[in-house]
Amino acid sequence: NCLNFGNPEKGKVMGQFVETIDGISQACTYLDFPVVSGNVSFYNETQNKAISPTPTIGGVGLIKNLNLMMTKNLKEIGSYIFVVGKTSGHLDQSEFFREVLKIYEGPSPEINLFNEKNNGKAIQKLILSKLVNSVHDISTGGILLTLSEMCIAGKIGAKIKVPQDNVGPHEYLFGEDQSRYLIEVNEKSKDKTCN
């Protein structure tokens, strides 16, 4: 674990550091997630310009039954892939904005600890109930990159149907809303999983 920041003698940088510590503290308390060690690195600057605040936290968990360990690779041709969590299509600060459109502004996606905990518990329940073949968290790159990683790992392709609701196709496929997962479900588990 490491927290990397610029010069703490500058008010903006110290403010970023304080807000980061506060956010980590809130998340660890709410999610009952211990951070057992850490390092802080200050004065990370180039030509008197600070790096972006870069907190890095590694997590370790216990898997009670290795036979239920979940991986991201798609397992079965003809299975269904569902999104768990709300998709609002947040593109600000996304890989799509930065890498494709060269837009480097806007707020980061909102983090809702209640949704994070509840969606995580729902995924855990699906895994323990043996209702899913594979699971992958949706993060950098949104649904499309996450699904690509699952397809490549499983050497299986996928067809995507973008819902016709209030989120456009780019927002749906590349949005980086938090607390979401892609799950692979086979035909016999589909009805139980969706209830």
Q: What positions do the PLM features span?
A:
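Mobile "lid/hinge" segments at catalytic clefts and subdomain interfaces of large enzymes
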Residues: 1-7, 13, 17, 25, ...
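Glycine-/charge-enriched secondary-structure boundary and capping motifs
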Residues: 13-27, 31, 36, 40-56, ...
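Hydrophobic side chains in well-ordered alpha-helices
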Residues: 119-122, 192-193
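Internal, well-ordered alpha-helical scaffold/interface segments
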Residues: 121-124, 145
